[in-house]
Amino acid sequence: MAHYKVEQDDWLTVYLKYLLFIFNFFFWVGGAAVMAVGVWTLVEKSGYLGVLASSTFAASAYILIFAGALVMVTGFLGFGAVIREDRGCLSAYFCLLLAIFLVELVAGVLAHVYYQRLSDELKQHLTRTLAENYRQPGAAEITASVDRLQQDFKCCGSNSSADWLQSSYILSPEAEGRRVPDSCCKTVVARCGQRAHPSNIYKVEGGCISKLEQFLADHLLLMGAVGIGVACLQICGMILTCGLHRRLQLHFY
């Protein structure tokens, strides 16, 4: 009977090792996905960050990149800990899993807080940006962000093209008679903004605010979904790590 119990204990240890090894593979892939989402958000969509009043959106993406990179490094430690059956490495692996979980939790909270105030921030800041900062000295980044926003989303003005009538740029001689910036035009050519007819410029219900709000909401949802998926994996991993650590401890004694 004692011999059977020893064999059973050995099989439990082997079973836990295989489970943890499989988990670690998916965990490593999940880390790569988290980092990829963060990098993609910053690289491909950074052109819109200049029109946001808060840096929370960018901060969430940076945290995801950091967490993803840490996950991939931790994954290698996990493979080594399982293969070597080293309790010290397993303890370090568990601590890193817990640390990554907390980092992702912070990113999730930031994303949720930002999502709650997203609409109000856009309405206040984008309208003011168009009126006060577009084509003004020292505002080249904001100007480029607004131009890209209007061209990519095929919109004009924060709520409508009429918002540009309050713009310092449009009211200045520099505008050369433009009623909207050239980036509002369906086909951008020099001084095309002088003709603000629906056949020439984008007329979108809700303006650029509605388009940008939906875009940011979709990205926050994607970041949240990826983060939650990896966090669930981590909880499973911590449970398996504790189980294997306990089995190895019993074998040691």
UniProtKB/Swiss-Prot annotation:
The keyword Transmembrane helix applies. InterPro entries: Tetraspanin/Peripherin, Tetraspanin_animals, Tetraspanin_EC2_sf. GO terms for cellular component: plasma membrane. It is found in: Membrane. It is a multi-pass membrane protein. The keyword Transmembrane applies. Keywords: Membrane, Transmembrane, Transmembrane helix. The chain crosses the membrane at residues 19-39, 63-83, 90-110, 220-240. Belongs to the tetraspanin (TM4SF) family. This is Tetraspanin-11. It comes from Bos taurus. The gene is TSPAN11.
